[in-house]
UniProtKB/Swiss-Prot annotation:
The UniProt record lists the keyword Ion transport: no
Family: Belongs to the radical SAM superfamily. Lipoyl synthase family.
Domain of life: Bacteria
Compartment list: Cytoplasm
Record organism: Flavobacterium johnsoniae (strain ATCC 17061 / DSM 2064 / JCM 8514 / BCRC 14874 / CCUG 350202 / NBRC 14942 / NCIMB 11054 / UW101) (Cytophaga johnsonae)
Enzyme kind, highest EC tier: transferase
The protein, known as: Lipoyl synthase
Lineage, top ranks: Bacteria, Pseudomonadati, Bacteroidota, Flavobacteriia, Flavobacteriales
């Protein structure tokens, strides 16, 4: 009897292999992170671009703990009952940025649907603390959707970071499978609302390789432009563990280049599109 093997994941292509991070700036920052036990997504997420970003003086920090109230099929962050809020966290993050001498900081967080404010007060206080301690550091905030509650989003607007980002993550058809507790249109409305309230630069990101079609990617990019989003990042989805959604396809560099060209034609200020692109890749140039 012939054995049929199903759902064999595609082999990882050569273009996803990266060099080990090197360089004086990287070595200095790595030493500081280890010495002071600083919490960066760059290290905890084993980002392939860590060496390049640190070399340019950019780093990403996660606030509000490391346990998320949502269980997205793509994300490697732990799901469950989050820790209590650390009200000293804003000062700790600001101090980390000062120690590392970061020129451009990206702040992100888990979803905190357990909190009435969605964590927005800590978000606002973190931005303010960074401003006080690091007046020359520019900021990007990669925020959750706050369940679309405007008063919580308004706290981000009031803090006025240079860039506010909220990721769509995938195309409309796959949203329920990929982000079960999120809504495609709600995310678009968050991005549209941020722009309407006066945020200078808005940004979003999507992952490819989850089974989307080219036309669905184009439509998502059009939806983002219709919401007046300025910057889009497009990268390859990589499965964190076997419990997460499988990779359906590895997108070629040529197709990523095609999406970049289309995004520029649509009028995005910046388009980062490539296999290793992540939300905060080249983030420092997105304020320009």
């Amino acid at each position: 009897m012939e054995t049929v093997i199903e759902n064999i994941p595609p082999a990882k292509p050569k273009w996803l292999k990266v060099k080990l991070p090197i360089g004086q700036k990287y070595t200095e920052l790595r030493g500081l992170v280890d010495k002071y036990s600083l919490n960066t997504i760059c290290t905890s997420g084993s980002c392939p671009n860590m060496g390049e970003c640190w070399g340019e003086g950019t780093a990403t920090f996660m606030i509000l703990g490391n346990v998320c109230t949502r269980s997205c099929g793509f994300c490697g962050v732990k799901t469950g009952r989050p820790e209590t809020v650390d009200w000293d966290e804003p000062e700790k993050v600001a101090r980390s940025i000062k120690i590392m001498n970061i020129k451009h900081a990206v702040i992100t967080s888990v979803d905190r649907d357990d909190l009435k404010d969605g964590g927005s007060i800590i978000w606002m206080e973190t931005v303010r603390a960074i401003r006080r301690m690091n007046p020359n550091t520019t900021l990007e905030t990669l925020i959750p959707d706050f369940q679309g509650i405007e008063r919580n989003i308004d706290r981000i607007v009031e803090a006025n970071p240079e860039v506010v980002s909220h990721n769509m993550e995938t195309v409309r058809r796959l949203t329920r499978e990929v982000r079960i507790q999120a809504k495609y249109d709600r995310s678009l409305e968050v991005l549209r609302y941020l722009k309407e309230k006066g945020i200078n630069r808005t940004k979003s990101g999507i992952m490819l390789g989850l089974g989307e079609t080219e036309e669905e990617v184009y439509q998502t990019m059009r939806d983002l432009r219709d919401a007046n989003v300025d910057v889009v990042t497009i990268g390859q989805y990589l499965q964190p563990t076997k419990k997460h959604l499988p990779v359906k396809e590895f997108i070629t560099p040529e197709l990523f280049a095609k999406y970049e060209k289309y995004g520029i034609e649509l009028g995005f200020r910046h388009v980062e599109s490539g296999p290793l692109v992540r939300s905060s890749y080249k983030a420092q140039k997105h304020i320009l």
